[in-house]
Amino acid sequence: MQEQYRPEEIESKVQLHWDEKRTFEVTEDESKEKYYCLSMLPYPSGRLHMGHVRNYTIGDVIARYQRMLGKNVLQPIGWDAFGLPAEGAAVKNNTAPAPWTYDNIAYMKNQLKMLGFGYDWSRELATCTPEYYRWEQKFFTELYKKGLVYKKTSAVNWCPNDQTVLANEQVIDGCCWRCDTKVERKEIPQWFIKITAYADELLNDLDKLDHWPDTVKTMQRNWIGRSEGVEITFNVNDYDNTLTVYTTRPDTFMGCTYLAVAAGHPLAQKAAENNPELAAFIDECRNTKVAEAEMATMEKKGVNTGFKAVHPLTGEEIPVWAANFVLMEYGTGAVMAVPGHDQRDYEFASKYGLNIKPVILAADGSEPDLSQQALTEKGVLFNSGEFNGLDHEAAFNAIADKLTAMGVGERKVNYRLRDWGVSRQRYWGAPIPMVTLEDGTVMPTPDDQLPVILPEDVVMDGITSPIKADPQWAKTTVNGMPALRETDTFDTFMESSWYYARYTCPEYKEGMLDSEAANYWLPVDIYIGGIEHAIMHLLYFRFFHKLMRDAGMVNSDEPAKQLLCQGMVLADAFYYVGENGERNWVSPVDAIVERDEKGRIVKAKDAAGHELVYTGMSKMSKSKNNGIDPQVMVERYGADTVRLFMMFASPADMTLEWQESGVEGANRFLKRVWKLVYEHTAKGDVAALNVDALTEDQKALRRDVHKTIAKVTDDIGRRQTFNTAIAAIMELMNKLAKAPTDGEQDRALMQEALLAVVRMLNPFTPHICFTLWQELKGEGDIDNAPWPVADEKAMVEDSTLVVVQVNGKVRAKITVPVDATEEQVRERAGQEHLVAKYLDGVTVRKVIYVPGKLLNLVVG
């Protein structure tokens, strides 16, 4: 064994061994308990970033640990390979998205291997290959036949820069989430999948997900947004149609003083024909689409349509306004306004001088003061005719019943969730498998024409999709009739909604899934990824699983038992102000810093001498130029060091602050482990451990070894607090470094301890552990070695610490044998100087003894 730890030599050797032996390739084995560990698949952007490294290290630690428990562990990897960035990069680099993507996959695959992740590479898949997306296309046609897919023209969020549709979730502050361009509204035909048909199940089954973070479940609950209320129909004077509104507060109905409709509502359009102010307002609304999240904070604006609706219970005429806070795609595109009891309605009414009528009493039974704000709490009705005196629930039911009896109301369950629009006007995605015949009939692409292959040899102009620009591509024939293919492609969330299931049978050619293999491995035991996916990917992922279940492919209700959302990786961020006042961000690698005595950065400059402004730690990003290249760190310190730092620096679900000093610390620790094994093995063979012949000190050290095994097992397995597991191993290493190594049993004990340490570290730092296991002559490869088991007998304490009090005040702490009697403990306590001086010349009136813990002497 060489004396120095040289990761650059051992890591490549061990990785080659894994490749040659196909160590991590698995097949279904009914005799073994399975464990499916999955990290969210990466987008092949070109290089791994530290966020990837953190996600995949957590997954690999869990997978290797479960493997050492004797389970049949599947840990696959693949590439979420379609998507917009490839198109931009292709234009910029004068290439096509396909070669750019495949080059990136090859490069990033090497990076993943360099980090030593134990993946089953035989199952690798890329979602941009026809072998993958053909089954997605086939499944889509099946959903169409079941009535779960439809096409309709809808107002969409359009990014003029990316030339594509954005989901509501992808609009942030009225701008595109990707390129920050102002989003426009546009009407285009789109394909939708009926996720709303599964809304109740998606909501109710959240209760089955005991091992998902509450934050994610709450976000999904709110996104699905189930509510119970009443749909109410109003007659409108001089208008051919009625207006329907939905309310969850029918108890406030007697306080409704105006209605508000969306700018796109037919009533507003009709009124605008003779109202230039309203027409201009509608245009303004059309061009300033906001995501629902911004609704609460934006300025509320409106224009009176001139129409009057009739309140069905009071007969009063109330004005109908067009307002920018009503969305056409939510509910009916019209809302009833109760300014006395809804703050938004109150602000709007105050701004435009509309009537505010209170109908709910304050909590103390007095009439509410509405001079400053609405009273939004529920309470007892007044000012409401026959409903006066009713509380919220009674009023809800009484008013709902009355409206229903009159034929102008109906109880309804509503959802915020909208159907999933899956059409994208981009090229680099899976073609949507639908065709339009000459007579206008729309139908699914026949099975014998699947997959509809996306041509990869294309020229990108950066504006129009090549399959839209080439009229020949769309031409086909169906049943001998000319037809045109759909030229939109799928939202890339389609591919990432079912990849986890395809990993169970990536070579299967008879269909989307081999049910036998899928049902052996599914559901996923732990799924690891960022919380930013809570409402898009993780909802579609659950939805797709239910669709596949209902198609008879899988027999479970949910795709993943546990979800672990890893925290972000942060790094120092610095900038200097340029000549034009712009911020020039400087990489932390290039910043020369001065720190105070507490290690805080007080001054910084770059190599060119610019004084730098330090903005603190923030998420690693291109925009702040504060990303740290994992490859540089691996080349400098080795993969094991980077992995160990990632798992030690912070709990897995919390943010991690990148500190190179911490990486250096992890590297020093691994050098110490190497050195201890080197010194131990240099002394030659080791005798068998005889536990009965150990001295008290040896027993104490062995107790520490086995207590550490117990703690690390609990920390990795049950608690998933990997940082505390590493801390416990480090603490044990400190004790082992000081332990005597001269005697035969000293060395035998050291052998047992080091074999345990190397196995406990193996999930975190597999290359060094593989090598040290061989040097320690462990049985076989460490990859097949069992996890160490704590010896209960070894952990039994011979002695215990007893706190000694005199009149309730702690005077000493004494160590006594665990089987010591009360008399022996009292005798031992009396020998302590600090106890004896308080007993001198006084009488012990009472003794309180809690065996093995506390002795309290009451004196007087």
Swiss-Prot record:
Pfam entry (one): Anticodon_1
Listed GO biological process terms: leucyl-tRNA aminoacylation
Enzyme Commission number: 6.1.1.4
Keywords assigned by UniProt, alphabetized: Aminoacyl-tRNA synthetase, ATP-binding, Cytoplasm, Ligase, Nucleotide-binding, Protein biosynthesis
EC category name: ligase
Positions occupied by motif 'HIGH' region: 42-52
Catalytically driven reaction(s): tRNA(Leu) + L-leucine + ATP = L-leucyl-tRNA(Leu) + AMP + diphosphate
Residue positions binding ATP: K622
Single GO MF annotation: leucine-tRNA ligase activity
Coiled-coil regions, chain positions: none
Renumbered ranges of motif 'KMSKS' region: 619-623
PANTHER family: LEUCINE--TRNA LIGASE, MITOCHONDRIAL, LEUCYL-TRNA SYNTHETASE
HAMAP family referenced in this protein's UniProt entry, alphabetically: Leu_tRNA_synth_B (MF_00049_B)
Entry similarity comment: Belongs to the class-I aminoacyl-tRNA synthetase family.
Protein name: Leucine--tRNA ligase
Gene from which the chain derives: leuS
